[in-house]
């Protein structure tokens, strides 16, 4: 198994970045529509377009600091963890998308896709 690990500086306070990760309307602006709620045990789906509805479950929540959930249960069976750290006048957002099969198309595809998605977060908050 292998992971994708990235970080992105966002010139907004952690509370705003947290909303981009946990507010369904904001999440849909930069990534995918879904009924996410930052509550441990909450089961939700993310609409990944041609890849279909992906089931998820919230594993860990530390408001404005950490959010972790399963992603694509029964298909990819990966875990997405977001970590937020205040930095200067904004937030350093860390992403760890863990549990990919080494050399898989999903690892390559998501590894190529995540950097552009992370850059969209700041625009979604504008």
Where are these regions (language model features)?
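A conserved amphipathic terminal alpha-helix motif
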Residues: 98-126
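Tryptophan-centric aromatic hotspots in well-structured domains and transmembrane helices
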Residues: 18-21, 30-31, 71, 82, ...
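Residues at secondary-structure transition points
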Residues: 12, 53, 75, 79, ...
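Hydrophobic ligand-binding cavity/cleft-lining segments
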Residues: 1-35
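Structured surface interface patches that mediate subunit assembly and partner/cofactor docking
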Residues: 26, 39-40, 115-116
């Amino acid at each position: 198994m292998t992971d994708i690990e990235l970080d992105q500086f966002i010139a907004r306070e952690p509370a705003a970045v947290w909303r981009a990760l946990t507010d369904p309307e904001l999440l849909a602006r930069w990534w995918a529509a879904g009924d996410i709620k930052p509550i441990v045990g909450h089961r939700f789906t993310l609409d990944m377009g041609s890849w279909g509805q992906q089931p998820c479950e919230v594993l860990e929540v530390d408001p404005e600091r950490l959010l972790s959930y399963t992603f694509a249960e029964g298909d990819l069976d990966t875990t997405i963890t977001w970590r937020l750290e205040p930095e200067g006048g904004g937030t350093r957002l860390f992403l760890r998308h863990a549990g990919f099969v080494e050399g898989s198309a999903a690892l390559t595809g998501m590894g190529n896709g995540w950097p552009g998605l992370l850059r969209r977060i700041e625009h979604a908050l504008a």
